[in-house]
């Protein structure tokens, strides 16, 4: 069952589009894009989340990421 969000699809899509535009503007290869985005997630967790909740949130984020990755052969 999809999770509901307090953020509109339009807002999420706008932010995603802007982030992708920055990466494309710099012709960022996939591995560097993943490194930068991973560092951004780590920074957000370490600076915005209470220490006692960081590991739980990181685990939840990792599980959500794994659940959203498709296994089809398209790329």
From Swiss-Prot:
InterPro entries: UPF0352, YejL_sf. Pfam families: DUF1414 (PF07208). Gene3D superfamilies: YejL-like (1.10.3390.10). Belongs to the UPF0352 family. HAMAP family: UPF0352. This is UPF0352 protein YPO1261/y2923/YP_0880.
């Amino acid at each position: 069952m999809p999770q509901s969000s307090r953020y509109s699809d339009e807002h999420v899509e706008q932010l995603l589009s802007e982030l992708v535009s920055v990466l494309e503007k710099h012709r960022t290869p996939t591995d560097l894009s993943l490194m930068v985005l991973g560092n951004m997630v780590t920074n957000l967790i370490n600076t915005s989340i209470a220490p006692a909740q960081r590991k739980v949130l990181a685990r939840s984020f990792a599980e959500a990421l794994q659940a959203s990755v498709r296994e089809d052969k398209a790329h």
